[in-house]
From Swiss-Prot, chains A, B:
Pfam families: CofC. InterPro entries: CofC, Nucleotide-diphossugar_trans. The lineage of its organism: Archaea, Methanobacteriati, Methanobacteriota, Stenosarchaea group, Methanomicrobia. Homodimer. This is 2-phospho-L-lactate guanylyltransferase. It catalyses: (2S)-2-phospholactate + GTP + H(+) = (2S)-lactyl-2-diphospho-5'-guanosine + diphosphate. The gene is cofC.
Length: 215, 215
């Protein structure tokens, strides 16, 4: 089965909730490293990758569409172009593997979906993308389940820690350092001086070697 | 295959990180509701449940051992008693299902493990429990992987959002309200006036109807 993976990506000033520990240049490099991890998994699973970018961007192994409208409008524009099944996958879930994506595309339902933490949606696979519309922001998982019902789609919810782990906050970096063996994003963090640290209550967080800071 | 599920449980003043929204009596009732969800999944999967309690506690459908030593010592004492495979499962992962537990106990490896968020360990299944020792607190997932290696165990890491979601903080309640259909813990939260709410940035959180507060 041939299909496209649609990956929204913000190349300029992304991941602002990480500003407390990464400056803009670093956040841009880190977001690209996570994107590489996602693209690698997508391509290994047999999909072609199309990046929906807010700004001009080049990538050797992916098509790029620059769209300046809000995220939902950009995705819905793209879905309207597709005559084959489509995967909408976020660029900030670097723990995803090709095998994980296979779990979605092998669904017997019309649609499969992976919730993100906190009510979000991290991946949607659609056999008939033109019938669907995306509604990200807020409790998008519930919104997407409702929209699927309105479309008359049968839905499989995929249970996965790796795919549900989107990286937004400092605490999320722990997951990459612990579970991200072999990932470009982990390499980036390690080369930038990040490591696991325990606070006085034994809770796990990250620390940064001050010699590696460019802030 | 016959085996025991070992569930550590603190009946008195549990879940103190929820003190900002639940008083002690409420936290005790909520912890019991989550425990009921876990016990229901455990029993439906064909296991018997043994609670390792810090204080005196009674339960109709589970054996209770009151152990006043620290958590790791209590678990390691219990593992030493077992001559059959054992599951160590936390009482604060109410999204777990019987099918999820089956994924662990059907492993072909010597051990299967489910990481929790933030470096923790939420479930361990051990075919030879007497050889193992638990080391919770801190980055316990990495510690348990190391201990398994020292024991010469082959290990399967199970990828699951539901099982990796332990409920510690106010933000975690979102997961129960969104994904916890049919759970006792969700019923408790709803009856206590909790519902999903969006903040001004569109992020999902919980709110509580002030009429339902007993604080």
């Amino acid at each position: 089965m041939y299909f496209h993976a649609l990956i929204p990506f913000k190349p300029v000033n992304p991941k602002t909730r990480l500003s407390c520990i990464l400056n803009q240049e670093e956040r841009e490099a880190f977001a690209r490293a996570m994107l590489e991890d996602v693209i690698a998994a997508v391509q290994k699973s047999g999909c072609s990758a199309t990046l929906l970018c807010t700004h001009s961007f080049k990538h050797e192994n992916a098509l790029v569409a620059v769209r300046t409208e809000p995220l939902n409008d950009a995705i819905n524009w793209a879905l309207g172009q597709f005559h084959c099944p489509a995967l909408i996958i976020m660029g900030d879930i670097p723990l995803v593997t090709a095998g994980d994506i296979q779990r979605l595309i092998r669904t017997e339902k019309d649609m499969s979906i992976v919730p993100g933490r906190g009510g979000g949606t991290n991946i949607i696979f659609l056999k008939k993308p033109r019938c669907f519309r995306a509604d990200y922001y807020g409790a998008s998982f519930l919104d997407h389940m409702r929209i699927a019902e309105e479309c008359g789609f049968s839905v499989e919810v995929i249970d996965s820690f790796r795919m549900s782990t989107d990286i937004d906050e400092k605490e999320d970096l722990v997951e990459i350092l612990i579970h991200g063996k072999g990932r470009r994003s982990r390499e980036y963090l390690e080369n930038s001086g990040f490591s696991i640290a325990l606070d006085e209550k034994g809770r796990v967080g990250v620390q940064r070697d001050p010699h590696e800071e460019a802030l």
